[in-house]
């Protein structure tokens, strides 16, 4: 039994997602206590409960304490199996965050895992589904990871209603020494149940800032009439990206500006990955037993993921400060 203190480090839901994923992959039972202890709403949220429930289905796990508000849980995994699953997170719970828990597990299945997930595609405090598709999966493909994502409907806060199909194939992860990539900045600016000019203004503002800084960019715009009302923009270049959801009272120009300046901040440093991707890569480097990347700084999320990963796997991470960047590798 691997005991995890859920209040360690940043003390958020990512500890739970990472621990459950690694428990399923390694077959090691885990007990997680003090979940989100110091957060305004301690314990498991609805989307955490849903993610753990699906993880349990994938590995036929026995569980204890899996309910909204629970601060102590136990997870007893068995064999991982493929299949087709339909998941409704409810309202605008993040589809990308749920996939962060499921993706490491699915790669160790004996057959493909097909998922239809309903929830939020572009919400605050979570990667957008476009970021997951174009940055996270692009990086993981270098390690042999195979996953295809189709965005059928977008879901915004608070109604959600987005629909994403994902097919994850069994694969063997291999180490990769990620290096910096440059090229044309790409992106998608979108809105639903709003005038088309909202998406266009987001894109125009972002493009103006990026081109003024000397970058070539191509930003697609898209307007739809889905269940929920909202907007957002995701920009990416190599293994760096930014994502900003629109919100009531914030102008389209502000949304585009924030996305562009966030990406520019990452591109100013010669690191290979951005700060968001860095913490997502940690468990995969551990599972591959090798690899390295550089990032502009090590975030609390990344430190926490390293701590959790070292609890489950027989690996040790090395953190080296190099001028204006940080190199993270497996020793």
UniProtKB/Swiss-Prot annotation:
Question: Which domain of life, per UniProt?
Answer: Archaea
CDD domains associated with the record:
RNA_Cyclase_Class_II
Q: Where along the chain is ATP bound?
A: 100, 276-280
Keyword DNA damage in annotation: no
Q: What class of enzyme is it?
A: ligase
Establish whether keyword Cytoplasm is in the entry.
yes
Q: What is its EC number?
A: 6.5.1.4
Citing just one GO molecular function, the answer is: ATP binding
Q: Which InterPro entries does UniProt cross-reference here?
A: RNA3'-term_phos_cycl_insert, RNA3'_phos_cyclase_dom, RNA3'_phos_cyclase_dom_sf, RNA3'_term_phos_cyc, RNA3'_term_phos_cyc_type_1, RNA3'_term_phos_cycl-like_CS, RNA3'P_cycl/enolpyr_Trfase_a/b, RPTC_insert
Where is the protein found, in the record's own terms?
Answer: Cytoplasm
Catalytic activity entry: a 3'-end 3'-phospho-ribonucleotide-RNA + ATP = a 3'-end 2',3'-cyclophospho-ribonucleotide-RNA + AMP + diphosphate
Which BP terms from GO are recorded? RNA processing
What keywords is this UniProt entry annotated with?
A: ATP-binding, Cytoplasm, Ligase, Nucleotide-binding
Gene Ontology cellular component terms for the protein in this record:
cytoplasm
- Give the positions the UniProt entry annotates as the active site: 301
Q: What family is it from?
A: Belongs to the RNA 3'-terminal cyclase family. Type 1 subfamily.
Q: What does this chain do? A: Catalyzes the conversion of 3'-phosphate to a 2',3'-cyclic phosphodiester at the end of RNA. The mechanism of action of the enzyme occurs in 3 steps: (A) adenylation of the enzyme by ATP; (B) transfer of adenylate to an RNA-N3'P to produce RNA-N3'PP5'A; (C) and attack of the adjacent 2'-hydroxyl on the 3'-phosphorus in the diester linkage to produce the cyclic end product. The biological role of this enzyme is unknown but it is likely to function in some aspects of cellular RNA processing.
Identify this protein by name.
RNA 3'-terminal phosphate cyclase
Please name the taxonomic classification of the source. Archaea, Methanobacteriati, Methanobacteriota, Stenosarchaea group, Methanomicrobia
Encoding gene (name): rtcA
């Amino acid at each position: 039994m691997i005991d995890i203190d859920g209040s360690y480090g940043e003390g958020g839901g990512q500890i739970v997602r990472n621990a459950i994923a690694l428990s399923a992959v390694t077959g090691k039972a885990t007990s997680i206590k003090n979940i989100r202890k110091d957060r305004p709403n301690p314990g498991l949220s609805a989307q955490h409960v849903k993610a753990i429930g699906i993880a349990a289905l994938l590995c036929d796990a026995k569980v204890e304490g899996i309910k909204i508000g629970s601060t102590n849980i136990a997870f007893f995994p068995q064999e991982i199996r493929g299949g087709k699953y339909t998941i409704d997170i409810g309202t605008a719970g993040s589809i990308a965050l749920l996939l962060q828990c499921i993706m490491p597990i699915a790669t160790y299945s004996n057959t493909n895992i097909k998922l239809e997930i309903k929830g939020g595609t572009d919400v605050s405090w979570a990667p957008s589904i476009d970021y997951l598709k174009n940055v996270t999966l692009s990086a993981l493909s270098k390690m042999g990871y195979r996953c295809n994502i189709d965005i059928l409907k977008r879901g915004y806060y608070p109604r959600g209603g987005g629909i994403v199909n994902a097919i994850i194939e069994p694969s063997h992860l291999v180490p990769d020494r990620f290096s910096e990539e440059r090229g044309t900045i790409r992106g998608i600016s979108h809105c639903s149940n709003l005038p088309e000019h909202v998406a266009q203004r987001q894109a125009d503002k972002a493009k103006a800032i990026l081109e003024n800084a000397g970058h070539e960019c191509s930003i697609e715009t898209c307007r739809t009439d889905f269940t929920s009302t909202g907007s957002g923009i995701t920009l990416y270049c190599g293994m760096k990206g930014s994502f900003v959801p629109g919100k009531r009272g914030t102008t389209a120009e502000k949304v585009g500006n924030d996305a562009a300046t966030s990406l520019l901040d990452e591109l100013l440093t010669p690191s290979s990955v951005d700060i968001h991707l860095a913490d997502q890569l940690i468990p995969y480097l551990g599972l591959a037993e090798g690899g390295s990347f550089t990032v502009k700084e090590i975030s609390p999320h990344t430190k926490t993921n390293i701590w959790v990963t070292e609890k489950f796997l027989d690996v040790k991470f090395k953190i080296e400060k190099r001028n204006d960047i940080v190199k993270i590798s497996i020793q």
